[in-house]
Amino acid sequence: MTIAREAHIVDLVDQSGASVGEATVGAAHTAPGRLHRAFSVFLRDPANGSLLLQQRAAVKTRFPLRWANTCCGHPLPGEDVEVAAGRRLAEELGVAGVAFTRVGVHTYRAEDPATGRVEYEYDHVLLGDLPAGVQPVPDPAEVAETRWVSLSALLDGFSADPEPYSPWLFGVTACLAEHLAQPHLPRPNAGRFDAPERSGGR
């Protein structure tokens, strides 16, 4: 499944997020990397504000077994980011019907020292609340483990030892922390999406 996903198409972008072309997942993540559109989802428990983290499966071609946000992926060229995020969340964790809020964009480049593969992403950060009565059911081909953490505990974890975490997690968490500290800001592009066909993840 991971190998097949390398052939999926991603949206190449410039530093402002404007589309400039297309490439396969495999080509976009081959050194030195090509900047492309991605998303990072945080799923929140509305009862206590905790956030769901996932440990990436061992078969991932980039940063396997690192802890990351709830799920990540790439929209298809021209596809709405929230639509792709809703599909990916359902694929990896069995959670559908989530309303997303865009909380920021994190652009970063990171090379996996073990595989030489590169993440170079214009990463839309999304926040959604876990629907009432729903329990995540991780796909073991995508997710090794999950855990719920508070935002403060996650930030403390970065300070204590950043090694177990994916290289993008600090940046996307900083976007989320800034958003949550400013609840008066507008929340554009929120939407509700259910789960259809499979899409490209990362």
Task: Describe the role of every protein-language-model region.
Residues T2-S40, R44-N48:
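Acidic, metal-coordinating catalytic segment for phosphate/diphosphate chemistry
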